[in-house]
Amino acid sequence: MIKLVAIDVDGTLTDKDRLISTRAIEFIRKAEKKGIIVSLLSGNVIPVVYALKVFIGINGPVFGENGGVMFDNDGSITKFFSNEKTNSFLDEMSKKTSMRSIFTNKWREASTGFDIDGKDVDYVKAEAEKRGLVVFYSGYSWHLMNKGEDKGFAVKILKEKYGLNYEEILVVGDSNNDMPMFELPVFKACPANATDNVKKASDFVSSYSYGEEIGEVFSHFNLL
């Protein structure tokens, strides 16, 4: 029996223009009324996911920076990683390549976001790996992370916090940065717009896309 659902935001709750599906919000609220714990896991910053928690009415903790920072129900913020190394790497690479900072970095505490020209991507990825850092593109922005800082880490935190077994957890996501939580022995679902590797890892692939899948996913797993 599933007791907790961890949901990605961009592309999973939102459409191509990053507008949240109002239908998804309705189904989340219905599931919560049945006692399901819902958590959001995003690559975005804590102020953004905090606002989503408040205005949607999310009843579980929410994670920003792909699991690097958590806002809990008691109002506390836990930072699991530091952005000291990632910011230093950005400073170094910005002098050698087109790698450049983005607006949301003023709120990032555990990672670094950036823009970059395609010609420099392979070089920056290789240099980051030498320093024990990870570079990936979420489909919406570039992220520079510490090793181990991912959504799989966040799901493990939720599992421990609520004393759950993996088979009591459902994860829903659409892109490559969601794969770490899809590699755990949990239930997995995705929208029709998901990447091929996410679809292959999923127990259920919805026929709907961009947030409209939440109702079908929740119905499939008997959460409504």
Swiss-Prot record:
Pfam families: Hydrolase_3. It comes from the Archaea. Belongs to the archaeal SPP-like hydrolase family. Its cofactor is Mg(2+). Substrate binds at residue 151. Keywords: Carbohydrate metabolism, Hydrolase, Magnesium, Metal-binding. Catalyzes the dephosphorylation of 2-phosphoglycolate. This is Phosphoglycolate phosphatase. NCBIfam families: HAD-SF-IIB (TIGR01484), Pglycolate_arch (TIGR01487), PRK01158.1 (NF002245), SPP-subfamily (TIGR01482). InterPro entries: HAD-like_sf, HAD-SF_hydro_IIB, HAD_sf, PGPase. Its EC number is 3.1.3.18. Transmembrane segments: none annotated. It catalyses: 2-phosphoglycolate + H2O = glycolate + phosphate. GO terms for molecular function: magnesium ion binding; phosphoglycolate phosphatase activity. It is an enzyme of class 3 (hydrolase). The active site is at 8 (nucleophile).
